[in-house]
Amino acid sequence: MMKTSVMFMLVVVISLMCSSEAQEVARTYCGRDLADTLADLCFGVEKRGVAQYAPYFWTRQYLGSRGKRGVVDECCFRPCTLDVLLSYCG
């Protein structure tokens, strides 16, 4: 009986942790707030080398609307998540 209760509580705690991570809140980041958040998120992220950009020059015409917008368009003019901001690191 005790083992079942502990197991049930463990399952409940794990599922609550997973659901809270999946529900990341989108918000707007503008000005200094945007710059500071990007600096904090991107600290230690490896910079991309020139070789990694080579395909970019050949496929630029095939990029979706994301290739035409910037971080301000995506995160200041409308809410975005930290995952979107992380995509601008490097």
Swiss-Prot record:
Residues 1-20 form the signal peptide. Residues 49-67 form a propeptide. GO terms for cellular component: extracellular space. Keywords: Cleavage on pair of basic residues, Disulfide bond, Hormone, Secreted, Signal. It is found in: Secreted. InterPro entries: Bombyxin, Bombyxin_B, Insulin-like, Insulin-like_sf, Insulin_CS, Insulin_family. One of its GO terms (molecular function) is growth factor activity. GO terms for biological process: positive regulation of activated T cell proliferation; positive regulation of insulin receptor signaling pathway; positive regulation of MAPK cascade; positive regulation of transcription by RNA polymerase II; positive regulation of vascular endothelial cell proliferation; regulation of muscle cell differentiation. Its main location: secreted. Disulfide bonds join 30-76, 42-89, 75-80. Belongs to the insulin family. PANTHER family: INSULIN-LIKE GROWTH FACTOR II. Heterodimer of a B chain and an A chain linked by two disulfide bonds. Brain peptide responsible for activation of prothoracic glands to produce ecdysone in insects. Silk worm has two kinds of PTTH: 4K-PTTH and 22K-PTTH; there are many forms of 4K-PTTH. This is Bombyxin B-6. The lineage of its organism: Eukaryota, Metazoa, Ecdysozoa, Arthropoda, Hexapoda.
